[in-house]
C-alpha cells in the first residue's frame, strides 16, 4: 500500500503543465482524466516539485507556484503592506526586487525560471490587502474564485490580519487551520486532505477498539503533535522555576592562566606598534596570521555610544582574579555563553546581562557591524570560516560574534583566552576612556600594540598576551575595552541537542492540538533564521535527540556551502542521519543527485536501512546501490539515469551508494556527474596520504562533503586534520599543516608517557578542540546499557613455550617484529594452528581435520616440518577425532579461557560473538566448539552479503545458535548482532578502532542488555599490540573526548579479579586462575579492566 501511495507514475501531459507552472510562475487548472491522472498522481507530483494545489474550481484543481518566502517573512510583509498607504505600498513592491529568495532557488532548481519571485510575492501582497479591506459579502464570493484562500500559509495570514484589522473572522468554515505563525507543512491543501481521507478510509480498524496495522503504517493518517517527537527530544520547561532565568553570572571561564603568580608585562624588550600592519607567527612555510592592527578603525562616536550600553556589564562578579593579581576585576560577558560545566538543564544561552538588556543592546549594533566588516576585509578566510561555524541563533546583530567580553579599568596579567574559535580571531577594540599606556602585548611576537579609543586589533587569542603598565596610574584613569569572538562550546553536541529540543517544543506549541496530516515536516520551521530541514512526519519520532542534533549541525554547514565531519560513536545511527539528510536535500532539490561512498561490505547495510525506514516515509525517487546482489538491476538503473541525463526522460533525483573501487569507473561513464552532496561513510579512509579515492572525489565540483565516522582518528592526529581539510579547504589556510603537526607532537609526547609534557599537551589539546568544533559534530557518549570491558592475560602451555623459545619470542623481541609476522599470533591460538600455518595446511584442516596434502606443493611444505612437528600435528588431529577435547584445549591458554567463557554464556542462555583476525584461528575455534556440541556459525570476510544477512537473521531468531565466529577486519563492518551481549576479541590489531568497530556490532542502538567484552591477550605476542593500542586510545580521548590522557604504566595496572563487584563473575575469574594448562601454567594469569589501560589526568 505504501508503494502505491508514494510512487505513482506521472503522465507526460501533467509533467508539461507542471513544468509551465514551475518555469513561468503562472497558475494552471487541471481535471482528473486518463491523460492527466488521478488525484493521487496529481498531489504526489505537485508535492515532489514543491508546488501548491488548491481544490477549486469545482471538480478540478488549481496548481500554483511554490511560495518563495518563509511563513513568518510572508506574514510580516503582509502586515506591513496592508497597513501601508499607496506610496508606501509602491516602495514595498519595489524593494521586493532587491532581496534574495533562497526558497525560490530550491523550488525551480533545474528549471529555467521565466519570472522573478518578486512578481509572485507582489501578487500575494496585493491579494491580501484587498481581502483584508473587502466587505463581508465579497469575502464569501472569493472562496469560489481565489485559489490563494485554499493554500497555507496565505489563507491563515489573511485570516489573521483581517481579524485584527476588522474583528471579522475568516469566512471559510471548512478550514481547521493552525495559527498563522505555524511552520510550513509542505503543500497543505484541500486536495491533499481529500487524499488523506481516502487513505484513512482504507486503513480504518475493523476490530473493536484497536487500530489495524495498515492504519499505523499509513503515511496519510494524521499524527497528533505529542507523537511527533520522542519524549526526550522535546525541551522540558518548569514554569514555576524557569531555569532560563537562573543567575549564573560570574561562573563563566574565559581565561587560561598558567601560574598562580600573576605575570605582568612591561614595555621593556617589546616593540611598540603604532602603525597599521599584519603580523605572522613565522616566516616562509607554515606561516599564519596572528595579529592585524588597525589604528582608528572605528569612529569614536560609534565606540562611545556602544560604551554607554556595554560598560554596565563589567562587574566584579567573575572568576578572573588570577589575571588581576588576585582581586576580581571589573569585567563581564555580553551575548551567549556555554555553561557546559554547570549543573543546569539550560547550558547554552544568553548571559544574565543580555537577558535583562536585549532592548538596549541594539545601540551597540553599529559598533559590532563595523568590527565585523573590518574583520571580513582584513582577515577574510578567518572571517569566512567563523561565519560558517557560528550557529545562526547565536549571532550578535548578524555578525560572526557570539560573545563580547567587556573589561573596564582592567590591566590583564599574562593569559590565553579559553574556548575561542581557533579558525577565527578575537577582535579587540577600546571603546571609551582617558589613559596612557596599558598597551596589549603578545609575548611570542615581542610586540605591544597601542590601543586608544577606536583602535582595533584582530589577534590569535590562544597566544599569551596581557597589558603593559599604565602610565601615571596615580592620576584617575578610565579604559573600557571589548573583545568580540565566537565561543566554541556553543557548537558542542550538548548545545546542538539542547537547541534541537527547544525547536521541537516551539513546533509543538505552534501546532497546538492540530493533527499533522502532511507526509513531510520542516523541523526547523520554528526558527526562520535556520535553513529548512524536511523529514518524513512519521520518521521524526524515531530520530533520537543526538540524531536530530547532528542533522541540525549538518544543514547549517551545507547552507553555508561547507562540509563537516560527523563523529558519532558506533551504534548511534549515523546511517539514518545520512539518509534523512538525503531526503531533505532531495525534497528541496528534487532533480539533484547525491553520492554516497562506502566500503563494499557496508553497501547492503545502507540498502537495508533505506528499506527499513521506508515504512516511515523515507522514500527516494531513485536509490541506486552497487551491492553486487543484483548486477542486472544495477545496470538497468544506470541506463535509466543515462536516459534522464540525456533528456530522453524527465530528470529525477538519484542517490548513488557505491564503493570506492567502483568510483573511477562510474565517473568515466558519467563524465558530467555533478552531485549536490557527497557523503563518505567510514570516512577516515579519505584521511590517508596519497589516497586515490580522495583524488577522484576532488575532481567532482561539490563543496558539500560530509564524512561519517565513529573513529575519525585511527593512528595519529594528522588524520583528523586531513579530514577537516577535505570537508572545508579553507582550514589549511588559517592553520597550516606544519603548525598542526607541532600541536599533535605535543600531545603525542605526553600520551607516550612524558609527564613533563603535560602543560604543552593540555594547551595543544584545547587548541585543536577549539579549532575543529565548527566543522566536527562529536558525540562519543551514549545512553546504552553498561559495558564491562576486560583484558584477560592468558598463560602458555609447555608446548607453546617450547615454540616461543624456538622463535626467540620475548617481550623485548616482540617489539622488533613486523606487523606482517603472523606466526606468534597463530602460536598463541594453539600449537595445531601454528603448525598448520607454517605448513600451509589450512585447506586440509578445514576440509576434515587431516594433514594429508592434496598437491605436490603442499607435500613439500609439510615435509619441511621437523618430524616431531609432523607427528604432533597428526596427534592433535587425532585428539579431536577421538574426542579428547579437554587435552587438546589445554594445549593453549587462550583456547582454554575461550571455551570456558563459551560454556558459561551457554549456561546463562545468552549469546556470544567471537572476533578473530586470522582464518586459521577462526577455523580452529569453529571446529573446537562444534566438537563440543556448541551450535556455532562462522562468517568470514570472503563470504557474500547474502550469507552475512542470513547469519544475522539466523542468529537473531534461532535460540539454539549460541556463537558467531566473525572476521574482525571485514565481517565486523555493517552488521548488527545485538542478539549477543558477550563479545570475545580472540586477538587484537594494532589499531584499536578496528576492535572498537567489532564491539559495536553488539554494543549499539537496540541493545537492551549489559555487554561484556573479553580481550584475550597472551603473555608475549599481544603485549606490544596492546601498548600500541593504548597510546592511540589516549590520543583519541585527548582530542575527541576532551580528556587529557596517557598510557598507563605497567605498575599502574591492578588485577581486578579479587575485587570484582559481580559475585558470579568474580567466581568465574577465580576458577580460570586455578585451571592449569598442559605443563602446569595457569590458564588465566591476570584480569584488568580495559579502560584502566589509559589514565586520565586531573
UniProtKB/Swiss-Prot annotation:
ATP binds at residues 568-575. A motif (DEAH box) lies at residues 681-684. It catalyses: ATP + H2O = ADP + phosphate + H(+); thymine + 2-oxoglutarate + O2 = 5-hydroxymethyluracil + succinate + CO2. 2-oxoglutarate binds at residue 479. GO terms for biological process: base J metabolic process; double-strand break repair via homologous recombination; reciprocal meiotic recombination. It is found in: Nucleus. Gene3D superfamilies: 3.60.130.30, P-loop containing nucleotide triphosphate hydrolases, Tandem AAA-ATPase domain. Residues 897-1057 form the Helicase C-terminal domain. Fe cation binds at residues 415, 417, 465. InterPro entries: 2OGFeDO_JBP1/TET_oxygenase_dom, Helicase_ATP-bd, Helicase_C-like, P-loop_NTPase, SNF2-like_sf, SNF2/RAD54-like_C, SNF2_N, SNF2_RAD54_helicase_repair. Its cofactor is Fe(2+). Residues 1-540 are annotated as: Thymine dioxygenase. Residues 541-1098 are annotated as: DNA Helicase. Keywords: ATP-binding, Dioxygenase, DNA-binding, Helicase, Hydrolase, Iron, Metal-binding, Nucleotide-binding, Nucleus, Oxidoreductase. In the C-terminal section; belongs to the SNF2/RAD54 helicase family. This is Bifunctional helicase and thymine dioxygenase JBP2. It comes from Leishmania tarentolae. The gene is JBP2.
Amino acid at each position: 500500500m505504501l508503494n502505491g501511495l508514494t510512487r505513482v507514475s506521472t503522465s507526460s501531459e501533467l509533467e508539461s503543465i507542471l513544468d509551465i507552472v514551475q518555469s513561468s510562475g503562472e497558475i494552471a487548472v487541471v481535471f482528473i482524466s486518463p491523460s492527466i491522472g488521478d488525484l493521487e498522481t496529481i498531489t504526489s507530483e505537485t508535492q515532489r516539485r514543491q508546488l501548491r494545489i488548491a481544490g477549486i474550481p469545482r471538480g478540478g484543481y488549481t496548481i500554483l507556484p511554490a511560495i518563495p518566502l518563509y511563513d513568518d517573512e510572508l506574514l510580516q510583509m503582509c502586515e506591513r503592506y496592508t497597513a501601508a498607504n499607496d506610496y508606501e505600498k509602491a516602495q514595498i513592491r519595489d524593494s521586493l526586487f532587491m532581496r534574495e529568495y533562497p526558497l525560490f532557488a530550491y523550488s525551480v532548481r533545474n528549471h529555467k525560471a521565466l519570472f522573478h519571485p518578486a512578481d509572485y510575492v507582489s501578487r500575494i501582497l496585493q491579494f491580501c490587502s484587498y481581502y483584508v479591506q473587502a466587505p463581508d459579502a465579497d469575502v464569501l464570493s472569493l472562496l469560489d474564485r481565489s485559489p490563494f484562500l485554499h493554500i497555507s500559509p496565505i489563507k491563515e495570514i489573511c485570516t489573521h490580519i483581517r481579524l485584527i484589522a476588522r474583528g471579522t473572522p475568516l469566512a471559510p468554515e471548512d478550514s481547521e487551520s493552525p495559527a498563522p505563525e505555524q511552520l510550513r507543512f509542505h503543500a497543505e491543501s484541500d486536495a491533499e486532505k481529500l487524499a488523506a481521507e481516502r487513505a484513512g478510509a482504507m486503513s480504518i480498524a475493523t476490530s473493536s477498539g484497536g487500530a489495524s496495522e495498515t492504519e499505523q503504517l499509513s503515511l496519510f493518517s494524521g499524527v497528533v503533535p505529542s507523537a511527533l517527537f520522542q519524549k526526550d527530544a522535546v525541551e522540558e520547561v518548569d514554569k514555576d522555576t524557569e531555569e532560563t532565568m537562573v543567575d549564573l553570572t560570574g561562573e563563566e571561564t574565559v581565561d587560561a592562566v598558567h601560574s598562580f603568580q600573576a605575570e605582568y608585562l612591561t614595555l621593556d624588550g617589546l616593540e611598540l606598534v603604532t602603525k597599521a600592519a599584519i603580523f605572522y607567527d613565522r616566516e616562509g612555510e607554515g606561516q599564519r596570521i596572528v595579529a592585524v592592527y588597525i589604528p582608528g578603525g572605528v569612529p569614536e562616536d560609534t565606540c562611545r555610544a556602544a560604551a554607554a550600553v556595554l560598560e554596565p556589564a563589567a562587574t566584579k562578579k567573575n572568576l578572573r582574579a588570577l589575571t588581576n593579581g588576585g582581586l576580581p576585576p571589573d569585567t563581564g560577558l555580553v551575548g551567549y555563553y556555554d555553561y557546559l560545566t554547570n549543573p543546569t538543564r539550560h547550558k547554552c544561552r544568553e548571559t544574565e546581562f543580555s537577558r535583562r538588556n536585549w532592548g538596549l543592546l541594539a545601540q551597540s549594533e553599529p559598533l559590532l557591524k563595523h568590527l565585523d566588516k573590518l574583520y571580513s576585509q582584513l582577515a577574510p578566510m578567518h572571517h569566512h570560516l567563523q561565519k560558517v561555524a557560528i550557529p545562526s541563533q547565536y549571532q550578535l546583530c548578524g555578525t560572526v560574534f557570539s560573545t563580547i567580553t567587556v573589561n573596564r579599568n582592567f590591566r590583564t596579567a599574562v593569559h590565553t583566552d579559553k574556548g575561542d574559535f581557533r579558525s577565527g580571531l578575537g577582535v579587540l577594540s577600546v571603546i571609551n576612556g582617558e589613559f596612557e599606556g596599558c598597551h596589549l602585548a603578545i609575548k611570542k611576537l615581542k610586540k605591544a600594540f597601542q590601543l586608544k579609543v577606536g583602535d582595533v586589533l584582530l589577534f590569535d587569542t590562544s597566544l599569551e598576551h596581557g597589558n603593559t603598565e599604565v602610565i601615571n596610574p596615580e592620576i584617575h584613569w578610565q579604559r573600557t575595552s571589548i573583545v568580540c569572538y565566537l565561543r566554541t562550546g556553543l557548537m558542542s553536541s550538548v548545545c546542538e541537542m539542547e537547541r534541537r529540543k527547544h525547536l521541537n517544543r516551539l513546533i509543538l506549541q505552534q501546532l497546538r492540538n492540530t493533527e499533522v496530516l502532511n507526509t513531510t515536516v520542516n523541523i526547523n520551521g520554528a526558527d526562520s533564521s535556520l535553513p529548512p530541514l524536511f523529514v518524513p512526519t512519521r520518521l521524526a519520532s524515531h530520530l533520537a535527540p543526538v540524531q536530530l542534533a547532528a542533522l541540525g549541525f549538518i544543514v547549517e554547514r551545507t547552507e553555508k556551502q561547507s562540509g563537516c565531519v560527523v563523529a558519532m560513536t558506533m551504534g548511534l545511527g549515523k546511517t539514518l542521519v545520512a539518509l534523512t539528510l538525503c531526503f531533505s536535500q532531495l525534497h528541496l532539490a528534487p532533480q539533484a543527485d547525491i553520492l554516497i561512498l562506502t566500503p563494499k561490505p557496508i553497501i547492503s547495510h545502507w540498502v537495508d536501512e533505506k528499506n527499513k525506514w521506508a515504512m516511515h516515509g523515507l522514500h527516494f525517487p531513485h536509490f541506486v546501490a552497487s551491492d553486487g546482489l543484483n548486477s542486472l538491476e544495477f545496470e538497468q538503473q544506470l541506463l535509466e539515469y543515462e536516459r534522464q541525463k540525456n533528456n530522453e526522460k524527465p530528470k529525477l533525483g538519484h542517490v548513488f551508494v557505491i564503493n570506492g573501487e567502483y568510483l573511477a569507473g562510474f565517473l568515466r561513464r558519467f563524465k558530467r556527474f555533478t552531485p549536490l552532496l557527497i557523503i563518505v561513510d567510514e570516512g577516515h579512509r579519505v584521511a590517508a596520504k596519497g589516497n586515490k579515492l580522495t583524488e577522484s572525489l576532488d575532481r567532482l565540483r561539490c563543496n558539500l562533503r560530509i564524512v561519517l565516522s565513529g573513529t575519525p582518528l585511527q593512528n595519529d592526529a594528522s588524520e583528523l586534520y586531513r579530514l577537516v581539510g577535505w570537508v572545508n579547504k579553507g582550514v589549511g589556510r588559517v592553520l597550516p599543516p606544519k603548525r598542526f603537526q607541532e600541536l599533535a607532537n605535543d600531545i603525542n609526547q605526553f600520551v607516550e608517557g612524558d609527564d613533563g609534557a603535560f602543560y604543552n599537551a593540555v594547551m595543544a589539546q584545547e587548541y585543536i578542540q577549539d579549532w575543529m568544533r565548527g566543522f566536527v559534530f562529536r558525540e562519543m557518549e551514549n545512553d546504552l546499557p553498561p559495558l564491562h570491558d576486560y583484558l584477560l592475560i592468558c598463560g602458555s602451555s609447555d608446548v607453546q613455550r617450547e615454540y616461543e623459545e624456538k622463535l626467540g619470542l620475548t617481550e623485548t623481541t616482540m617489539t622488533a617484529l613486523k606487523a606482517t609476522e603472523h606466526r606468534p599470533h597463530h602460536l598463541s591460538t594453539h600449537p595445531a594452528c601454528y603448525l598448520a600455518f607454517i605448513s600451509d595446511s589450512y585447506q586440509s584442516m578445514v576440509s576434515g581435520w587431516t594433514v594429508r596434502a592434496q598437491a605436490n606443493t603442499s607435500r613439500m611444505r609439510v615435509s619441511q616440518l621437523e618430524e616431531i612437528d609432523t607427528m604432533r600435528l597428526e596427534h592433535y588431529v587425532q585428539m579431536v577425532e577421538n574426542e579428547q577435547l579437554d587435552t587438546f584445549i589445554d594445549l593453549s591458554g587462550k583456547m582454554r579461557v575461550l571455551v570456558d567463557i563459551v560454556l558459561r554464556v551457554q549456561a546463562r542462555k545468552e549469546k556470544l560473538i567471537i572476533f578473530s583476525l586470522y582464518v586459521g584461528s577462526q577455523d580452529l575455534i569453529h571446529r573446537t566448539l562444534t566438537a563440543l556440541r556448541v551450535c556455532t556459525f562462522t562468517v568470514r570476510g570472503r563470504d557474500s552479503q547474502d550469507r552475512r544477512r542470513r547469519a544475522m537473521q539466523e542468529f537473531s531468531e534461532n535460540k539454539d545458535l549460541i556463537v558467531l565466529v566473525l572476521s574482525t577486519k571485514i565481517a565486523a563492518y555493517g552488521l548488527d548482532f545485538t542478539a549477543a551481549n558477550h563479545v570475545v576479541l580472540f586477538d587484537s590489531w594494532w589499531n584499536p578502532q578496528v576492535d572498537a568497530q567489532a564491539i559495536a556490532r553488539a554494543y549499539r542502538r537496540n541493545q537492551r542488555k549489559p555487554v561484556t567484552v573479553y580481550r584475550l591477550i597472551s603473555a608475549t605476542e599481544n603485549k606490544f599490540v596492546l601498548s600500541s593500542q593504548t597510546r592511540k586510545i589516549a590520543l583519541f580521548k585527548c582530542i575527541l573526548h576532551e580528556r587529557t590522557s596517557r598510557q598507563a604504566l605497567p605498575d599502574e595496572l591492578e588485577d581486578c579479579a579479587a575485587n570484582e563487584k559481580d559475585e558470579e563473575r568474580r567466581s568465574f575469574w577465580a576458577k580460570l586462575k586455578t585451571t592449569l594448562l598442559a605443563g602446569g601454567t595457569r590458564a588465566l594469569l591476570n584480569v584488568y579492566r580495559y579502560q584502566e589501560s589509559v589514565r586520565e589526568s586531573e
